[in-house]
């Protein structure tokens, strides 16, 4: 009961329109950066397997830098340091750029690992049928690779949603920033931050459950495949004995 006594409904209702506008920006940034990083992650993964040594080293350096440094530092560097070199980026584009570069570096490694996990025998078999390298990649390797990493991709998208709150550091008008401003104006930090907390949870929780569901589906799929495979091997062994 003491918890609810600390919440002021009139302040919550007054703050709701402002915070919901911030939520729309949060969702917009998440969607846009998700599309960019998912797409660029594939391209960077292919680039890291390129025959060009310069391209491989350049992309490898980019991935190592962005995976080895905190996202907040990357964001601050893009917004506050690049102007010293004559590159001034407004808050929202700077936030989108930082998130995209950060998550592309991680997603490309997810893609690369999944591509390399596809058995080489399938690639050889496809080439033996006369398929070109590009066709093999699109029709044989990618469908199998992407299917196995869907839970991981969804998990990264949930993390991306949560990391949008850090854009408040560079004054992006997302949900966290608007909550901070309203809390500072009303001095009711408990009510405002509880609202922001609940809204983040309401948006992020379905994503977390989706990841759990997909992981369970993948486990069941692998289990059923292993049962079928073992049954086929048993039948084959019996046939050979006869």
Where does each model-flagged region fall?
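Transmembrane alpha-helices and adjacent helix-loop boundaries
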Residues: 1-242
């Amino acid at each position: 009961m003491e918890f609810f006594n600390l919440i002021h409904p009139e302040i919550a209702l007054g703050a709701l329109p402002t915070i919901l506008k911030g939520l729309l920006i949060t969702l917009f940034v998440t969607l846009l950066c998700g599309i960019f990083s998912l797409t660029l992650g594939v391209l960077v993964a292919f680039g890291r397997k390129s025959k060009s040594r310069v391209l491989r080293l350049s992309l490898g350096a980019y991935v190592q830098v962005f995976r080895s440094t905190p996202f907040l530092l990357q964001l601050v560097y893009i917004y506050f340091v690049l102007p010293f070199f004559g590159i001034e980026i407004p808050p929202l584009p700077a936030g989108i750029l930082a998130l995209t570069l950060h998550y592309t570096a991680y997603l490309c490694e997810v893609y690369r690992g999944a591509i390399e996990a596809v058995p080489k025998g399938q690639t050889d078999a496809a080439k033996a049928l006369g398929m070109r390298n590009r066709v093999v990649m699109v029709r044989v390797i990618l469908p199998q690779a992407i299917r196995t990493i869907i839970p991981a991709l969804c998990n990264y998208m949930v993390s991306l949603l949560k990391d949008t709150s850090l854009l408040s550091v560079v004054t992006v008008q997302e949900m966290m920033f608007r909550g901070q401003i309203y809390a500072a104006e009303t001095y009711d930090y408990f009510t405002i931050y509880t609202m922001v907390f609940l809204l983040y949870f309401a948006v992020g929780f379905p994503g977390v459950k989706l990841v759990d569901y997909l992981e369970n589906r993948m486990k069941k799929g692998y289990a059923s495949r292993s049962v079928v495979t073992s049954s086929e091997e048993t039948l084959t062994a019996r046939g050979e004995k006869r």
